[in-house]
Amino acid sequence: MPAARQQRGAAVEAAARALLEQAGLRLVVGNANYRGGELDLVMRDGPALVFVEVRYRRDDRFGGGAASVDWRKRRKLVLAAQLFLGAHPTLAALPCRFDVVDASGEPPVLHWIRDAFRADDC
């Protein structure tokens, strides 16, 4: 991936984290990599564990970032979340949800989609 694209991705993820922390969520870990995929942000929202996918698109011509979280991507996120929970058994009993932060435009405008999908939808 080109350096400029990596920088953009890191900046958008940092902005998404700041947005969520302003809303009261607390970071557990960022960029957790597993064989099946990556978890951009893992956060706590009260008693819930939240797996956050951050997607950036320059424009929403093809549906924007949220539209790019298709069933294949959702399945990878669920698998990565299962691996994360297996590696962190103290968190495994918590209720979980999957959120998406959709970023688009220049400068990016962020939209937080709580409970964007459920693990049993995949």
Swiss-Prot record:
SUPFAM superfamilies attached to this UniProt entry: Restriction endonuclease-like (SSF52980)
Entry GO MF terms: nucleic acid binding
Annotated organism of origin: Xanthomonas euvesicatoria pv. vesicatoria (strain 85-10)
Domain of life: Bacteria
Pfam families cross-referenced by the UniProt entry: UPF0102 (PF02021)
Family listed: Belongs to the UPF0102 family.
InterPro entries found in the cross-reference section: Restrct_endonuc-II-like, tRNA_endonuc-like_dom_sf, UPF0102_YraN-like
Name the record gives this protein: UPF0102 protein XCV0816
